[in-house]
């Protein structure tokens, strides 16, 4: 009898010990996250892309012949050299494969900074580029940059007639038939293509040595892997015709088109936050004004140029340029994590963040989205500090859910109106196929991805599984069900038909199938789909099956490759482990051994600051082209998962009662 009592006592003590360890881990992570809150209540973490944005920043300064900032250039040079891959070139993600365009830009920037072409790292880069056929294999965006520096001719890039700005909406190509990011990038680029300016480039730096042939002999790019041969040949023929007749267009027509592009740009100038609030259109806008003869003091050029410098992250030894900033996204996700963690410090901090978000809601401006939804009232949030023309559905859904949770769980008032307008806007932005896209509605002109300019395959913003899931989650958390709401019913049907055979869902904005599956399982759970539904069972089984031996989860960017649709193994990361845990718990699997092992992994890898170190990229800008490392993901997502685990284990229901 004594031995039985002793065993029971040991088991109880062990459980207490595990509970204390978990609670300590949550407390440390909470404290760590709170330390990043800004004085006005919001959070904003670094948002790092690959080497291309800092390289382009260096090249922009030399294009414009700006005074050389040797200290800043030295720091950017240190960054570029550090992220060079073992293969000699530069990757799109940490430890990733060689990428030609990234390598060409990084090499060019380092040479511009002053690195000798005989330096070992430059020799390795050049040899890696040569071994893969040379810089002729650069993508379209890189070729435009090379044309502007006079390294290749304008015959090496697609024709982008500025007269496109004058086409009616019913035409096959219209500026509002492509995504917001493509639209804002292309409008100033079309002006540049019309004027064909030459970089000032005071040092006269070139990179002819990266080519295996005379770069001025290079013609157009070949068909990209994602493109249909028939469509591509059609558009390639059209490009050839335009190349002949474009010089014959009336000058008055060209002037009117340029004026239309200028009006479009200046209406969306957006102060120091910049047009589109992302680097590429902002840089193109500055170069456009330069080509038009507007000096550095011209107000629209000057304000945009100041905005670009606000994207810099400058440390003691290194510096880089962010593609954009993510304060709304960081703030609402951190608030979710803190609400899950609870406590007398976490909840007030979350409220402070949510209060900061209230005036960030766009209630007046009808952005580009309204072209297809003119009768829908504005009500969304943008990703950045200010981006009135381009709110997004993902941010809006997540903000609404965090505010609703604060209202519901803590009786806080003042969010009702914001929630109602956000809900109204999201309901009005559902696409005809039942899904939701990030910024637009019914952006389904897939044939446009076959034009020569679209070698990146990211010209459109169609509905995706992850954004659809977030919108379904939000509507369901607000009380709608598939029985009471056509929006929810159509959204769930969209998710049901987009599940992959092995059980996963694609992740457009996070890497990749782990992210998509987390998003969808949260939505299905909130929408009332039974946990024994084969759709949920298959997804949960798949997640458990891909757990790494160390207890964590990881996935590589290679999973986005065109010839393979499925998860690609990778070392465990804190953020991807957190998504997998949150997904399994949404599926009712809090007691699954895989969940316990995942929690153990997070606790074991927590650092002395209570947070997690994560070098790998786990987010996506454009699949196969551009990836992101949110520095906040490894901070708030693991906290969220650990707190969710504790909360579910302390209840009898074991059911997640919120949309995320």
From Swiss-Prot:
A Pfam family it matches: SQHop_cyclase_C
Reactions performed catalytically: squalene = hop-22(29)-ene; squalene + H2O = hopan-22-ol
Keyword Cell membrane included in the entry's annotation: yes
Active site: 394
PFTB repeat spans: 73-114, 419-460, 536-586
A single MF term (Gene Ontology): lyase activity
Localization annotation: Cell membrane
UniProt keyword annotations, A-Z: Cell membrane, Isomerase, Lyase, Membrane, Repeat
Family classification: Belongs to the terpene cyclase/mutase family.
Protein name as catalogued: Squalene--hopene cyclase
Native source organism of the sequence: Bradyrhizobium diazoefficiens (strain JCM 10833 / BCRC 13528 / IAM 13628 / NBRC 14792 / USDA 110)
């Amino acid at each position: 009898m004594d031995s039985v009592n002793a065993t029971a006592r040991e088991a109880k003590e062990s459980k207490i010990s595990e509970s204390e360890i978990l609670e300590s881990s949550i407390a440390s992570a909470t404290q760590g996250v709170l330390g990043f809150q800004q004085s006005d209540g919001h959070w904003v973490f670094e948002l790092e892309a690959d080497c291309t944005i800092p390289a382009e920043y260096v090249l922009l300064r030399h294009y414009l012949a700006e005074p050389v900032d040797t200290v800043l250039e030295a720091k950017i040079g240190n960054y570029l050299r550090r992220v060079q891959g073992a293969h000699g070139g530069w990757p799109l993600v940490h430890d990733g494969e060689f990428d030609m365009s990234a390598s060409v830009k990084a090499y060019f920037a380092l040479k511009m900074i002053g690195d000798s072409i005989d330096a070992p790292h430059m020799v390795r880069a050049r040899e890696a580029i040569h071994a893969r056929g040379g810089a002729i294999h650069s993508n379209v965006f890189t070729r435009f940059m090379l044309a502007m520096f006079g390294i290749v001719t304008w015959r090496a890039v697609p024709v982008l007639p500025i007269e496109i700005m004058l086409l009616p909406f019913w035409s096959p190509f219209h500026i509002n038939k492509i995504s917001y990011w493509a639209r804002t990038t292309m409008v100033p680029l079309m002006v540049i293509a019309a004027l064909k300016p030459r970089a000032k480039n005071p040092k006269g730096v070139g990179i002819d040595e990266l080519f295996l042939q005379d770069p001025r002999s290079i013609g157009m790019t070949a068909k990209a892997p994602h493109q249909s041969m028939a469509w591509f040949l059609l558009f390639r023929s059209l490009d050839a015709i335009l190349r002949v007749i474009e010089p014959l267009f009336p000058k008055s027509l060209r002037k009117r088109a340029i004026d239309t592009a200028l009006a479009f740009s200046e209406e969306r100038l957006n102060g120091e936050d910049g047009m589109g609030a992302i680097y590429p259109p902002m840089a193109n806008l500055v170069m456009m004004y330069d080509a038009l003869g507007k000096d550095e003091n011209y107000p629209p050029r000057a304000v945009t140029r100041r905005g670009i410098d606000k994207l810099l992250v400058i440390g003691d030894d290194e510096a880089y340029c962010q593609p954009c900033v993510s304060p709304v996204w960081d703030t609402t996700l951190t608030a979710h994590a803190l609400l899950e963690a609870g406590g007398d410090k976490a909840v007030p901090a979350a409220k402070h963040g949510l209060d900061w978000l209230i005036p960030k809601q766009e209630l007046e401006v009808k952005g580009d989205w309204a072209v297809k939804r003119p009768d829908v009232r504005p009500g969304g949030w943008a990703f950045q500090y200010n981006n009135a023309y381009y709110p997004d559905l993902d941010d809006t859904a997540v903000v609404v859910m965090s505010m609703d949770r604060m209202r519901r769980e803590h009786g806080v008032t003042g969010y009702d109106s914001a929630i109602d307008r956000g809900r109204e806007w999201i309901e009005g932005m559902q696409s005809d196929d039942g899904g939701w896209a990030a910024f637009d509605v019914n952006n389904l002109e897939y044939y446009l991805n076959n034009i020569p300019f679209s070698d990146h395959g990211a010209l459109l913003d169609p509905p995706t599984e992850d954004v659809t899931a977030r919108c379904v989650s939000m509507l369901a958390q607000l009380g709608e069900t598939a029985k009471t709401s056509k929006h929810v019913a159509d959204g769930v049907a969209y998710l049901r038909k987009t599940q992959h055979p092995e059980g996963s869902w694609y992740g457009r904005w996070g890497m990749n199938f782990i992210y998509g599956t987390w998003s969808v399982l949260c939505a299905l759970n909130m929408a009332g789909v039974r946990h024994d539904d084969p759709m949920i069972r298959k997804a949960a089984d798949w997640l458990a099956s891909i757990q790494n031996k160390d207890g964590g989860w990881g996935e590589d960017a290679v999973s986005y490759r065109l010839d393979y649709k499925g998860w690609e193994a990778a070392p465990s990361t804190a953020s991807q482990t957190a998504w997998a845990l949150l997904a399994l718990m949404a599926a009712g699997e809090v007691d699954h051994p895989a969940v316990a092992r995942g929690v153990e992994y997070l606790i074991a890898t927590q650092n002395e600051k209570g947070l997690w170190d994560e070098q790998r990229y786990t987010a996506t800008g454009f699949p196969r082209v551009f990836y992101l490392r949110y520095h906040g993901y490894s901070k708030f997502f693991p906290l969220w998962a650990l707190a969710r685990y504790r909360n579910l284990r302390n209840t009898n229901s074991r059911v997640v009662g919120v949309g995320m």
